[in-house]
């Protein structure tokens, strides 16, 4: 495991804009992929006559290895730059990608948004149905302020490597981001050609008009997030394994506090108590884990069937909050008609996804000022900002956003789409017995 500081990175963007190729390029140039795997991917791509697809094949190979593998794969995808050690969480291309992005984004420290500059592709991504738009909105909700936009496929613009097209995309995407509250002075743009690696790890000979940093240099300008070590322990569980000869091994990322070997811990909402026998990250044993660490930990006294993805770990003297009801400030991002009391979307918060019923529309807010514009509105429609109360249908752990940001921001999904996004301003706790 590298001694460099570690950052979690997510790669987002519209389908077919070149996410896999970009990730493959980074991993090949700076990653931990052995030559053999690269050769196999190249041969598989050649057989199909798709030389340029070798990166996507490479990722598929890694994904298969991951799915077949018995190892707890927190290795995800790793690469190093001069300054940092990166883990790419959730390689793209999943049909559950938005769902994964919601849970993944809540663990990410930074994002690369891949946008194709090719005529028609860029426009599709920015259309109302487009994922470029959807992912920008979700990145904002999930608190991802560190964003690098890789404007890809610059070799396919008309004419190729067209500076005018690049500038037009930078302007439009920046404008859209500003409308959702991004500080675009902090967003970085770079024109790239992923298969060839132009402006990714080396300067492009084809775009002399661009003299800014490469993607890799931008990655080194990212900032490390503050580590909330002095806050109470919170670890949203991503997966639970039962490993023969070892026992129960939950996997997740420490969001706040410190977990030490020997600690007594509680899993909420189940209320199950166990003791930490060992902790590891990227196959390296550790005595303690801090915020930002992706870990697997072996627990004595808890069985795999007792706990699941979406549970949250804390210490018994300050257990994670189970919500009877919670109040949130939401923005309705998409809805064909209107939503009223009783509406029940699926709430995706940290690694959990639970249906929650709207129990009260408290007020509608003026989006510009945040002041109350209407008390107890009858319904909400697309574009509305409101204070709403939700009642979870099944036990759910959430926290106030200002106390534990990663456990207090969420997305509302329905009909396969993101309906809204929000942050939790208040939680009415449910009584749970800790046993």
From Swiss-Prot:
Domain tr-type G positions: 4-227
Kindly list the residue ranges recorded as spanning the membrane: none
Tell me which Pfam families the record gives: GTP-eEF1A_C, GTP_EFTU, GTP_EFTU_D2
Instruction: Provide the reaction this enzyme catalyses.
Output: GTP + H2O = GDP + phosphate + H(+)
Q: What does this protein do?
A: GTP hydrolase that promotes the GTP-dependent binding of aminoacyl-tRNA to the A-site of ribosomes during protein biosynthesis.
Question: By its UniProt entry, which PANTHER family does this protein fall under?
Answer: TRANSLATION FACTOR (PTHR23115)
Protein name per the record: Elongation factor 1-alpha
Gene symbol?
A: tuf
């Amino acid at each position: 495991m590298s001694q460099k500081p570690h950052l979690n990175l997510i790669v987002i963007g519209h389908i077919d804009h070149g996410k896999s190729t970009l990730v493959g390029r980074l991993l090949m140039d700076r990653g931990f992929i052995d030559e053999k795997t690269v050769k196999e991917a190249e041969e598989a791509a050649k057989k199909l006559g798709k030389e340029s697809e070798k990166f996507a094949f490479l990722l598929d190979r890694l994904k298969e290895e991951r799915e077949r593998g018995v190892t707890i794969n927190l290795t995800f995808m790793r690469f190093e730059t001069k300054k940092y050690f990166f883990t790419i969480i959730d390689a793209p291309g999943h049909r559950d990608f938005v769902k994964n992005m919601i849970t993944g984004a809540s663990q990410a420290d930074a994002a690369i948004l891949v946008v194709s500059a090719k005529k028609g592709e860029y426009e599709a991504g920015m259309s109302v149905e487009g994922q470029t738009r959807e992912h920008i909105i979700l990145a904002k909700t999930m608190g991802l302020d560190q964003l690098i936009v890789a404007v890809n496929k610059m070799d396919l613009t008309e004419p190729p490597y067209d500076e005018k097209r690049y500038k037009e995309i930078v302007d439009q995407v920046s404008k859209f981001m500003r409308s959702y509250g991004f500080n675009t002075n902090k967003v970085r743009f770079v024109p790239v050609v992923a298969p060839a690696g132009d402006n990714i790890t080396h300067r492009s000979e084809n775009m002399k008009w661009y003299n800014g940093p490469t993607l890799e240099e931008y990655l080194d300008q990212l900032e490390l997030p503050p580590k909330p070590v002095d806050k109470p322990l919170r670890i949203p569980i991503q997966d639970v394994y039962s490993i023969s000869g070892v026992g129960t091994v939950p996997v997740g990322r420490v969001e706040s506090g410190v977990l030490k070997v020997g600690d007594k811990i509680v899993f909420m909402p189940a209320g199950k108590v166990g003791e930490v026998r060992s902790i590891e990250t990227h196959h390296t044993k550790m005595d303690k884990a801090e915020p930002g660490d992706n870990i697997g930990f072996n627990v004595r006294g808890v069985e795999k069937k007792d706990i699941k993805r979406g549970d949250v770990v804390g210490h018994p003297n300050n257990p994670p909050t189970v919500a009877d009801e919670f109040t949130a400030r939401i923005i309705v991002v998409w809805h064909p008609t209107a939503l009223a009391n009783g509406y029940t979307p699926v709430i995706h918060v940290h690694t959990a996804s639970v249906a929650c019923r709207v129990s009260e529309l408290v007020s509608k807010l003026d989006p510009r000022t945040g002041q109350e514009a209407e008390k107890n509105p009858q319904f909400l429609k697309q574009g509305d900002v409101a204070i709403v109360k939700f009642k979870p249908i099944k036990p759910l752990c959430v926290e106030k956003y200002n106390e534990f940001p990663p456990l207090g921001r969420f997305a509302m999904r329905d009909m396969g789409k993101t309906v809204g996004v929000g942050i939790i301003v208040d939680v009415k706790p449910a009584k749970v017995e800790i046993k």
